[in-house]
Every structure is written in structure tokens, then in C-alpha cells.
């Protein structure tokens, strides 16, 4: 037991310590710092990239999310934003760029073409970037507005703040890795889509 001597009207040592110390878990502190310091690496392929470039203008103030510094190399980035149509010949370079990013790393799929192939249901277009990359947030639209990308950043920040991945990464053969099921969401929901026999009235919603 320790004793301290002070004036009766002086502030208690416990109160002084509470005012000058911050108590938190290390996982939460690391997640908080990472969610407010995203370093994006943009991979623009078609018209969705125009909307993404618009989101970088001062009108939308992407600096509010700590993601205004676009990196020129994937080795300095932890967020990959794929915007536009991903052709099969571009899938390999895109995967190489993703593999050069350090863990932890996140992926945003922006636009209908990146999400599911969009209107291009043909042999030369990848039907969803999630068939070879683990996507964290999907941004719908053709093309999506810059506000949709801002919402995606907010969703990604909330995901980063709650996940325990920053300090609990599973080690793979070549370095840190995380589980990834290479089944596109479009294929996973195919049976449910094919079972639909009646479409909802858009005027009723």
C-alpha cells in the first residue's frame, strides 16, 4: 500500500491519472490508427474511375477519412480500389499488384462491372473481381456517384475498427495471409436468383 500527502482540497492522484492516461486494448488502438490512415492504391479501368477521380476533389474532402494520399506503388498502400471493367488479361496484373501490398490490406470493388461483370456477360470479362481477390466492400452503381465511394470508406472504417485481424494474422507459406474463399458472390447467390419467379414492383418500394 502506498501513501501520499497533500492538501485536503487537492485533486486525488486517481483523478489526475484518469485525466492524463488513456486506457484501451492494443488491438483497438492499432485498429483505430489504421482506420484513420488508409493509403489507397487506385486501379481505374473504365468510366467508374472518372467518378473515383471526382471523389478526390476538394468538394468531397476525402481527407476527412484519412484516405486522400493516393500511393503510386502498391508496396506503400493498404487499400486497393478496383473501379471499372476487369478483363481477363488484366486479372493477372491486378492480382500481382494486390500480392505486393503488405498486410493488413483491404479491397473496395467499385461499380457494377467490378462487382459482377456488369452488362459484359462475355468470355473476356471477369464476372466479379471477388473471383480472385477478397473484396471487403462493394460499391453498386453504373457508374456509382462519388458519394457512394465516401459511404464505402465509412463502411470500411467501421469494419477495420471492429476486426481483430491487425494483431492476429495467420502466417502462410510466403507471409501473412487470411482465409479467402474464391467463390464470387454472384455465383454464391445464383440459385437464389434462379428461384425467383416473381419480381417486386419497383413502384411499391
From Swiss-Prot:
Organism of derivation: Cereibacter sphaeroides (strain ATCC 17023 / DSM 158 / JCM 6121 / CCUG 31486 / LMG 2827 / NBRC 12203 / NCIMB 8253 / ATH 2.4.1.)
Upper classification of the organism: Bacteria, Pseudomonadati, Pseudomonadota, Alphaproteobacteria, Rhodobacterales
Name listed for the protein in its UniProt record: NADH-quinone oxidoreductase subunit B 2
UniProt subcellular location: Cell inner membrane
Binding-site positions, [4Fe-4S] cluster: 47-48, 113, 142
Entry-linked InterPro entries: NADH_UbQ_OxRdtase-like_20kDa, NADH_UQ_OxRdtase_20Kd_su
Keywords recorded for this protein, A-Z: 4Fe-4S, Cell inner membrane, Cell membrane, Iron, Iron-sulfur, Membrane, Metal-binding, NAD, Quinone, Translocase, Transport, Ubiquinone
Pfam families cross-referenced by the UniProt entry: Oxidored_q6
Keyword Transcription regulation: no
GN (gene name): nuoB2
Cofactor names: [4Fe-4S] cluster
Amino acid at each position: 500500500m502506498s501513501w501520499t500527502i497533500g492538501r485536503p482540497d487537492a485533486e486525488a492522484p486517481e483523478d489526475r491519472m484518469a485525466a492524463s492516461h488513456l486506457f484501451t486494448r492494443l488491438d483497438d488502438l492499432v485498429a483505430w490508427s489504421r482506420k484513420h490512415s488508409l493509403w489507397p492504391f487506385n486501379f481505374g479501368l473504365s468510366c467508374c474511375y472518372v467518378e473515383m477521380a471526382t471523389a478526390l476533389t476538394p468538394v468531397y474532402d476525402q481527407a476527412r477519412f484519412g484516405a486522400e494520399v493516393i500511393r503510386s506503388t502498391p508496396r506503400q498502400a493498404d487499400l486497393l480500389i478496383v473501379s471499372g471493367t476487369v478483363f481477363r488479361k488484366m486479372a493477372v496484373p491486378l492480382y500481382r499488384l494486390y500480392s505486393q501490398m503488405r498486410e493488413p490490406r483491404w479491397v473496395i470493388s467499385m461499380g457494377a462491372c467490378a462487382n459482377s461483370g456488369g452488362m459484359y456477360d462475355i468470355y473476356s470479362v471477369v464476372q466479379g473481381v471477388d473471383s480472385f481477390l477478397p473484396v471487403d466492400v462493394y460499391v453498386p452503381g453504373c457508374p456509382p456517384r462519388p458519394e457512394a465511394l465516401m459511404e464505402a470508406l465509412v463502411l470500411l472504417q467501421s469494419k477495420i475498427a471492429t476486426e481483430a485481424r491487425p494483431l492476429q494474422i495467420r502466417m502462410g507459406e510466403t507471409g501473412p495471409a487470411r482465409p479467402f474463399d474464391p467463390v464470387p458472390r454472384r455465383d454464391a447467390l445464383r440459385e437464389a436468383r434462379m428461384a425467383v419467379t416473381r419480381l417486386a414492383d419497383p413502384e411499391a418500394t
